[in-house]
A protein has these predicted regions:
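Specific alpha-helical transmembrane segments that line the substrate/conduction pathway
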Residues: 35-43, 78-110, 149, 229-248
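C-terminal transmembrane-helix exit sites in multi-pass transporters
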Residues: 47-55, 78, 95-120, 127, ...
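Specific transmembrane alpha-helical segments of multi-pass solute transporters/efflux pumps
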Residues: 49, 55-93, 101, 121-128, ...
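Helix-helix packing/entry segments at the starts of transmembrane helices
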Residues: 88-95, 160-180, 210-249
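Hydrophobic transmembrane alpha-helices of multi-pass small-molecule transport proteins
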Residues: 48, 69, 111-131, 150, ...
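Glycine-/small-residue-enriched transmembrane alpha-helix faces in small-molecule transporters
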Residues: 1-35, 67, 74-75, 124, ...
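Hydrophobic alpha-helical transmembrane segments of multi-pass integral membrane proteins
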Residues: 3-10, 34-50, 118-121, 141, ...
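C-terminal-most transmembrane helix of multi-pass membrane proteins
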Residues: 37, 41, 237-282
Length: 282
């Protein structure tokens, strides 16, 4: 059990590490958002293909799942042009959970009163964070982009729930998303031109793709069968907090009282909504 707990902590550090790495790269102007996304997907695809075997990788995954993955990765990178690491991770996490809970409702799940209270609390927390006019409000464009990134990741996760081999499916989806990103890069560069990335930016993007994404997702799928659903959900609640602490240490970002209150409201609300058993519609 200690071994599983240690691996789970390592995976959560990897997930939070994606926020820190992209923010570190973009805040120092050593790489553009599109370049970071391209390298991240290519590096992730390469590592996952080596783990899953190249031939099987090309035959796995789906183009629709890959499109959702592309939406997540692209909007994630562009959102972090204007968001702190902790704030971005919190918005992403909240968006993912809200979409997934909404999907459950659409497919017949019924929420208990405590779950509705949790959803309300999480939404109030987001409103408190994003409400216009406050001095410490995050950039609205960045927040919207991160919300779209969360939508992409939620749809990707929902499609991958019943994959027979999650690692193989992820490898195939990363490979297909790499094809997509090359295709959209030319029109995007016309609209949002970027300078050539520096060596530092390239290295950070490779680490994000190969290690915190590729290896991180692989480890997560290895750990999941050994974790009860409640423990898996609780573990993921730690990611925004870890990202905020990492942003404070590595990026000199300020963790404000407002962010602390918002994080408590959102994570507490999501915990209430996801850890309490739902009912199926009769």
């Amino acid at each position: 059990m200690k071994y599983i707990s240690a691996l789970t902590l390592l995976v959560m550090l990897a997930f939070a590490g994606n926020s820190i790495l992209v923010r570190l790269a973009l805040s120092t102007d050593c790489i553009g958002s599109l370049s970071f996304s391209i390298i991240r997907l290519l590096a992730g695809a390469l590592v996952l293909a080596l783990i899953a075997k190249p031939k099987q990788t090309l035959e796995s995954g789906s183009w629709l799942s890959a499109l959702y993955l592309l939406v997540y990765v692209l909007f994630f990178s562009y959102a972090y042009l204007s968001l702190d690491a902790g704030t971005g991770a919190l918005i992403l996490f909240a968006a993912v959970q809200i979409v997934m809970i909404g999907s459950g409702l659409w497919h017949g799940e019924r929420l208990a009163a405590l779950q509705w209270a949790g959803m309300t609390m999480a939404c109030l927390g987001l409103f408190f964070l994003l409400r216009p006019g406050a001095a410490s409000s995050p950039n609205l464009t960045g927040a919207v982009l991160m919300g779209l990134s969360g939508l992409g990741w939620a749809l990707y996760s929902l499609r991958g729930r019943h994959a027979e081999s999650p690692v193989l499916a992820t490898a195939g989806n990363f490979a297909k998303a790499s094809v997509y990103v090359v295709g959209v890069s030319i029109p995007l560069l016309f609209v949002l031109p970027e300078e050539y990335p520096s060596a530092k930016g390239i290295v950070l993007a490779i680490i994000s793709g190969a290690i915190t994404s590729g290896l991180g997702y692989t480890l997560w799928y290895k750990v999941l069968p050994n974790l009860p659903a409640t423990r898996a959900s609780i573990a993921q609640l730690s990611v925004p907090a870890i990202a905020a602490i990492g942003g404070m240490i590595f990026l000199n970002e300020t963790v404000t009282t407002r962010l602390i209150i918002t994080t408590a409201l959102v994570l507490g609300g999501v915990a209430m909504a996801t850890l309490w058993p739902s009912k199926q519609a009769a």
